[in-house]
Amino acid sequence: MNIRPLQDRVLVRRAEEETKSAGGIILTGSAQEKPSQGEVVAVGNGKKLDNGSTQPMDVKVGDKVLFGKYSGSEVKVNDETLLMMREDDIMGIIG
């Protein structure tokens, strides 16, 4: 299955979860926090404005992004869990 986001939506692959804490303690599944950064894998065409024009997207495929802890909705694509979110949910592009 292939997904193309519509309008200002972005499909993000979450970064790998940390299995060790900063102090070196191995974390179990329930203790691990889901990362709030990832890589953009697909973007929509942009947000439709009231005047009918389309505002271009600031993010592009391949960008590493930072987003809120509860941003987006999980979607399953080819046995992989990805996040679908609006561009407004993205706080910044990493580096």
Swiss-Prot record:
Name of this chain's protein: Co-chaperonin GroES
Assembly information from the UniProt record: Heptamer of 7 subunits arranged in a ring. Interacts with the chaperonin GroEL.
Stored NCBIfam families: PRK00364.1-2 (NF001527), PRK00364.1-5 (NF001529), PRK00364.2-2 (NF001531), PRK00364.2-4 (NF001533)
Organism: Francisella philomiragia subsp. philomiragia (strain ATCC 25017 / CCUG 19701 / FSC 153 / O#319-036)
Compartment list: Cytoplasm
Pfam family, any one: Cpn10
GO molecular-function terms, A-Z: ATP binding; metal ion binding; protein folding chaperone; protein-folding chaperone binding; unfolded protein binding
PROSITE patterns: CHAPERONINS_CPN10
Family, similarity comment: Belongs to the GroES chaperonin family.
